[in-house]
Amino acid sequence: MDSDFSHAFQKELTCVICLNYLVDPVTICCGHSFCRPCLCLSWEEAQSPANCPACREPSPKMDFKTNILLKNLVTIARKASLWQFLSSEKQICGTHRQTKKMFCDMDKSLLCLLCSNSQEHGAHKHHPIEEAAEEHREKLLKQMRILWKKIQENQRNLYEEGRTAFLWRGNVVLRAQMIRNEYRKLHPVLHKEEKQHLERLNKEYQEIFQQLQRSWVKMDQKSKHLKEMYQELMEMCHKPDVELLQDLGDIVARSESVLLHMPQPVNPELTAGPITGLVYRLNRFRVEISFHFEVTNHNIRLFEDVRSWMFRRGPLNSDRSDYFAAWGARVFSFGKHYWELDVDNSCDWALGVCNNSWIRKNSTMVNSEDIFLLLCLKVDNHFNLLTTSPVFPHYIEKPLGRVGVFLDFESGSVSFLNVTKSSLIWSYPAGSLTFPVRPFFYTGHR
């Protein structure tokens, strides 16, 4: 009867994934419990919501607290297993006929209390076996939590690096075509400059593409090393107390060294190549713009939406108290118009044109078709440029000083210029602009 009860008790404390005692146990929504490391590895590639490994029921929540009750019960079960192991004749001290309850850190041996105080071992560090094992197991779990965060961070970077490499070629092809179209509007004498501009663009494309490829390979290799280390730590945690203490070695130091030199994503950036006469030509259509300023609590989610798009996460809470929006007093519906705005003192900004209907909406979304905007967002220490309709990244250096906006209703296009560099940032394809618009400016300090 006692044997049946003991077997049933052990079964309830066993993870169905690894078939060992639960380590850092968590109980998910359906009521089943697993080792946190086992669940992390099981759900690593799963889409949200993930399914329970036991009953396959969807689990909308993926972040759980440690089940303290189960953890304490597992500690009791481990203690019982340890005492069963120590009760064998082999674990009785031949000299003092006492149970070997102490562990010597120096020679990794089990000692009775009297031997641990002897002249031979007196200078060594020794601890009660169960206390030492639990202490080291907790250190391993702490290291695993750190390691898992790095695994996830590296996985996100790996995905983003692959995505950037995929977008990179298409981005450069579009930029080359845009540059050709712009030179067609200028004097034929600039043909040599156009050729040099495109050659420089192609050279930068090749160099940065190789950087992206090398970076992706490094991240992929680091991902394998991190997971191998995580698996090794997990296997160590699952070992019985005595085996854990004897086999521990330098595993913690090795796991710390794996965390060093984490590969960082490449921030690809093309040089803003000048186009002779670009700003001079557009200045013929220059207009003065006056703005109606709007209070900061207007429900505009431009930067939050773009950050969500960039990092493929849910809406991010962002303090908008330092942002303000402004709309042009004048509506444009025909002709050609050019103006400039100063963005030198802003970290995050958006400028361009929008439809009146977009302004009136309660929640202005960045993926709306009623706006043609150039956005600049600071993420960590890097500035990202994007345009809307659709949301599209531009891997080109951030403009300093003034940005030019050119409306051309004859071709149905909107263009953005780096005025300081006399460079074209982006020009929408002909036929994109088909409705009346007014200037828009949104800026802030972060």
Curated annotation (Swiss-Prot):
UniProt lists the family membership as follows: Belongs to the TRIM/RBCC family.
> PROSITE patterns, from UniProt?
B302_SPRY, ZF_BBOX, ZF_RING_1, ZF_RING_2
Q: Where are the B box-type-classified zinc fingers?
A: 88-129
Write down the InterPro entries for this protein, in alphabetical order: B30.2/SPRY, B30.2/SPRY_sf, Butyrophylin_SPRY, ConA-like_dom_sf, SPRY_dom, TRIM/RBCC, Znf_B-box, Znf_RING
**GO MF entries:** ubiquitin protein ligase activity; zinc ion binding
Please state, per the UniProt record, what induces or represses the expression of this protein. Answer: By DUX4 during herpesvirus infection.
A biological-process GO annotation: innate immune response
Residues given in the record as Zn(2+) binding sites: 93, 96, 115, 121
Q: Protein name, please?
A: Tripartite motif-containing protein 43
The UniProt function text for this chain reads:
E3 ligase that regulates nuclear lamina integrity and the association of viral chromatin with transcriptionally-active host chromatin. Acts thereby as a herpesvirus-specific antiviral factor and mediates the ubiquitination-dependent proteasomal degradation of PCNT.
